[in-house]
Structure formats: structure tokens, C-alpha cells
């Protein structure tokens, strides 16, 4: 069903950008697929449009009826770098958050770096998995093995920055 979603998403009113993701086993930070956990990122014209679509669009109704668990997380970007499929979907709109902060990191792993990337993944997964400042985390893939992303929610920005810039192999 996930692969067919692109046809419905292309037709949705007020949907400015979207991406479908698969996940890896465990917390998602492995190259072995988990065919029961998927992700969908949507950038809407407004939060009102997003909430209306979640309630009324047939695609979302089907997902809700078939899934054992779903989560919808509404966010406003505070920072963004680079392009994604030729677009800049996240336009910073808010000041630096005082409390919870969600982070989405995305990378296309070079073929020559795949082995070292996946060799480092278990260590990073273990560290983020035991960090008491992480509220939620999952590894996802836009394209299996190569185009990877992480999505995490932290208690605050300083905890996330400390993890990202001061811990072992994740530093570089």
C-alpha cells in the first residue's frame, strides 16, 4: 500500500512536498528492512490543511484503519540546510525552541562509504537508544541502503547538539 500512496499524494490539495520512507529493523538503524514500519513526511500549506487532510483524505483513512499504531507530529521548521529532490521544503518560521526539538537528518551515502557508514550505525544507534534526553528516534530510508535519514525528538536543543557534535563517531 505504501508504494501506491504516491498516486494519492500527488493529487492532495495544499500538499506542497512529501516523501515516503521505509525503516530498518529494531529502531530502524539497520540496512535490514522492517516491512511493518513506514514513514511519511508531508509539508502542508498550513496546519489547518494538514489536519483536514488527515481527517478527510481516503489515503489517510485507509492507513488509520489498517495500522496497529499511527502518529502524526506537527512541527514548524527552525532551521534547514540544502535541497531535497531539487526543492527547499522547510522554510524556517520560528525562533529557537525552548523545549522539545525534533531533528530530521538526511544523507545520500556515497557508494565508496557504504561499508563504513553501516559499520558505524550500530554504535550510534546504541548511544541514541540509551540517551535519556531522546524522547523518540527512528532510522528511515528514502532509497534502501543509500538514502538514509534519522528522525529524533529531544528534550531540548542543547541535548541534541551535545549528542551530534561531541559523541564519538557521530562527531564527523
Where are these regions (language model features)?
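A common structural junction motif
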Residues: 58-65, 171-172
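Short S/T/G/P-rich N-terminal loop/turn motif that feeds into the first structured element of a domain
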Residues: 1-38, 47-55, 65-149, 158-166
Amino acid at each position: 500500500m505504501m508504494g501506491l500512496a504516491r498516486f494519492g499524494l500527488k493529487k492532495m490539495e495544499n500538499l506542497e512536498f512529501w516523501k515516503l520512507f521505509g525503516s530498518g529493523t529494531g529502531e530502524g538503524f539497520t540496512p535490514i528492512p522492517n516491512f511493518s514500519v513506514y514513514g511519511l513526511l508531508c509539508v502542508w500549506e498550513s496546519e489547518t490543511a494538514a489536519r483536514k487532510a488527515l481527517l478527510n483524505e481516503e489515503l489517510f483513512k485507509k492507513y488509520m484503519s489498517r495500522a496497529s499504531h499511527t502518529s502524526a507530529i506537527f512541527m514548524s521548521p527552525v532551521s534547514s540546510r540544502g535541497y531535497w529532490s531539487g526543492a527547499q521544503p522547510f522554510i524556517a518560521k520560528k525562533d529557537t525552541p525552548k523545549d522539545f526539538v525534533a531533528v530530521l537528518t538526511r544523507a545520500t551515502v556515497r557508494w565508496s562509504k557504504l561499508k563504513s557508514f553501516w559499520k558505524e550505525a550500530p554504535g550510534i544507534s546504541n548511544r541514541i537508544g540509551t540517551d535519556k534526553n531522546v524522547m523518540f528516534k527512528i532510522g528511515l530510508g528514502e532509497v534502501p541502503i543509500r538514502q538514509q535519514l534519522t528522525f529524533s525528538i529531544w528534550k531540548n536543543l542543547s541535548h541534541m547538539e551535545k549528542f551530534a557534535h561531541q559523541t564519538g563517531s557521530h562527531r564527523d
